[in-house]
Amino acid sequence: QITKQVIEAGMTLGSHTWSHKDLARKPYATDLDLAKQEIEMGASAVHMAAGVPIAPFFRFPSLQHPPAMLIYLGERNIATFSTDIDSFDFRMHKPEQVIKSVMTKLEKRGKGIILMHDFQRGTAEALPELLRQLKAGGYKVVHMVPRQMLTTLPQYDDMVMKQDKLSSNNTRPENNVVHTIGQYIGGAPPATSDMHE
């Protein structure tokens, strides 16, 4: 449900692995087929939940980028995204702390990709004010849109179907993240929705 709302709101969805494993650690670091399975099943699951193809965009869990997996993703024409600024919002509970963390780091760097997690209530509550401060500071929120969508691989689609792990949960701690972002990138999101990392 949430994933479909994100798509309906005009957002771009990528993937982040099937079970959020650090692909730079064993067994994934030494078993490339297992690492590929983790990536591909994640993409298949998001595609199935969305009901439409997703962007060929990927971020590694723990921000670890194993060279062999970078090569694999390149062969699949999947763009990898990292981050320049980690909000560390998973360590904070108050919106003011999240805003201060992001703005302090952003002012030092001047620009960059900001990592935030939508499952944190403090993050969702901080987002409207953070976006206001970004706009007031002359920063832009950029909506990444792919030239073409990702084609998932049938064998991994089948694996996901057999797992039956797709959640039907359609709530997050603060159910306004997509709505808030949509106001800043020109989307027309539904009254209640959220985004998944």
What do the predicted segments below correspond to?
Residues G122-H196:
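C-terminal domain-boundary segment and adjacent tail
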Residues Q1-V98, M103-L115, E197:
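Metal-dependent polysaccharide deacetylase catalytic core of the NodB/CE4 family, i.e.
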Residues D118:
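Bacterial c-di-GMP phosphodiesterase catalytic domain signature
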